[in-house]
Swiss-Prot record:
Belongs to the thiolase-like superfamily. Chalcone/stilbene synthases family. This is Chalcone synthase. Pathway: Secondary metabolite biosynthesis; flavonoid biosynthesis. It comes from Matthiola incana (Common stock). InterPro entries: Chalcone/stilbene_synt_C, Chalcone/stilbene_synt_N, Chalcone/stilbene_synthase_AS, Polyketide_synthase_type-III, Thiolase-like. Its EC number is 2.3.1.74. The active site is at residue 168. The primary product of this enzyme is 4,2',4',6'-tetrahydroxychalcone (also termed naringenin-chalcone or chalcone) which can under specific conditions spontaneously isomerize into naringenin. CDD domains: CHS_like. One of its GO terms (molecular function) is naringenin-chalcone synthase activity.
Amino acid sequence: MVMGATSLDEIRKAQRADGPAGILGIGTANPANHVIQAEYPDYYFRITNSEHMTDLKEKFQRMCDKSMIRKRHMHLTEDFLKENPNMCAYMAPSLDARQDIVVVEVPKLGKEAAVRAIKEWGQPKSKITHLVFCTTSGVDMPGADYQLTKLLGLRPSVKRLMMYQQGCFAGGTVLRLAKDLAENNRGARVLVVCSEITAVTFRGPSDTHLDSLVGQALFSDGAAALIVGSDPDTSVGEKPIFEMVSAAQTILPDSDGAIDGHLREVGLTFHLLKDVPGLISKNIEKSLEEAFKPLGISDWNSLFWIAHPGGPAILDQVEIKLGLKAEKMRATRHVLSEYGNMSSACVLFILDEMRKKSAQDGVATTGEGLEWGVLFGFGPGLTVETVVLRSVPL
């Protein structure tokens, strides 16, 4: 018996959702331990036994002063670092000690964020069909996706996807993947988790590798989680916070080696080799034009903005290049100030901050009163993720 084309089309149609993917719940979490940025250079050079490097400390002080960061959360405490001097050296074998932390703490912090996202979503966790877990911190088998499934008590049949070692653009990547999963599987509810712990990158200073110091001045710990699904069931109280309209990824021209990370016996090493803010600002308009041409939008100030805050220079140069008003990056700069650069989790924190502030301010939509918005992830490659978002009325 040959199946007719019509019935096959019907099967395919029945497998797919009718509407666009929406974010149905957001949750965030950070370790309790935190550092005040103004005090961090003294602490960092003391704990790494580097106080004799006075010129380098002055450079690091300037990096921290210019970072626009007020505080950062970190799992690593002073007591722990005192017990693990190899992690405080610039290049000492320390991967085992680092792995012992991240394989436990990455899923644990992810669970905290996931519990909050599920609570806001308001549905039983048995309705979760897919899990996308992302971390740049450590690698293990079975992965953090498996550990989180166990910690949360999700169904064993949950379809899992584990993303390791992607870097700072991956907050956009997880949205792109969750969108495809939700829209191509009717009834799918995707739990997305980004969890980052800097225990894998922390190291002492080196006067021959200043680019490594940049990471020490910016990186921090945090986890964010979302529930993503299409066709929200309003009868049980499902309601989107943002809708995802399109998602794209590109590698910027002439950017090979601009940001590199390498997992070695000494942990994850981080290298900045080119003018990253310049490369991003030079190419960002092309990504915007490609994303918003179908919508007939070319006024970048008419959008709400969620950009990965790799550092203040990236935000400054993007603003100048595009002629953005200062308030466009308010939510982005707030998250950078209060949390630092949490790699893949940052843009999800900014989504959370934006919808909360929009509600507080009494504006018309979750996107600062505007209908259309853009979310950018920037990271190793240089890779850029561009997600077009639509807000919902408040």
